[in-house]
């Protein structure tokens, strides 16, 4: 019976390939998303002047719930992930001002603290995180914005208005609440 002989290099290469073949399916299963999310992901981008602004977020639905209230789904005065699932992110390709305050180019997680007359918009330095993993010590900027009434929107959305070559207005809109912020 012939003996198989492997050089150390061929043996290591064979073991490495075997490990890659066995690990790849496990990794693929962990990352698959065969089931549709209840709150689907969305993204919107807008060029303002020469600056690219991109917001990526999960879109929760109203589903006949009370949203923004003392006893609502999103209680007044508490930090909210501003969407569903992973933390909402907002990216700026260049340095900008938000509500008149400077913010460096980069990607930030975006949280809010809703209130009946004023919302706090939070730009947090940890961009890739689960939405509930908020760490206040990583906040880069907090600004205030005034909520407005708007037409009913079932699924939360972001969009841009009043865009010209130097500025634009980002808008968070869910149910009958709009929160515009100047960029």
Say what each PLM segment does.
Residues 2-13:
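Bacterial N-terminal signal peptides that target proteins for export
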Residues 14-15, 40, 82, 88, ...:
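Short, functionally important structural connectors and interaction interfaces within domains
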């Amino acid at each position: 019976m012939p003996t198989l002989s492997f050089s150390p290099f061929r043996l290591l290469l064979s073991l490495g390939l075997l490990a890659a073949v066995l690990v790849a399916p496990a990794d693929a299963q962990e990352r698959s998303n065969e089931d549709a999310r209840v709150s689907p992901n969305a993204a919107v981008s807008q060029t303002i002047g020469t600056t690219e602004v991109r917001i990526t977020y999960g879109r929760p639905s109203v589903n006949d719930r009370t949203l923004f209230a003392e006893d609502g789904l999103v209680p007044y005065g508490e930090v909210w992930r501003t969407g569903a699932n992973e933390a909402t992110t907002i990216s700026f390709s260049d340095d900008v001002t938000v509500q008149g305050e400077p913010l460096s180019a980069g990607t930030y997680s975006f949280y809010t603290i809703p209130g009946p007359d004023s919302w706090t918009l939070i730009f947090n330095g940890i961009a890739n995180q689960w939405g509930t993993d908020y760490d206040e010590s990583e906040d880069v900027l907090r600004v205030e914005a005034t909520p407005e009434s708007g037409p009913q929107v079932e699924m939360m959305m972001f969009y841009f208005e009043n865009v010209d070559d130097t500025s634009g207005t980002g808008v968070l809109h869910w149910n009958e609440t709009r929160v515009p912020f100047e960029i």
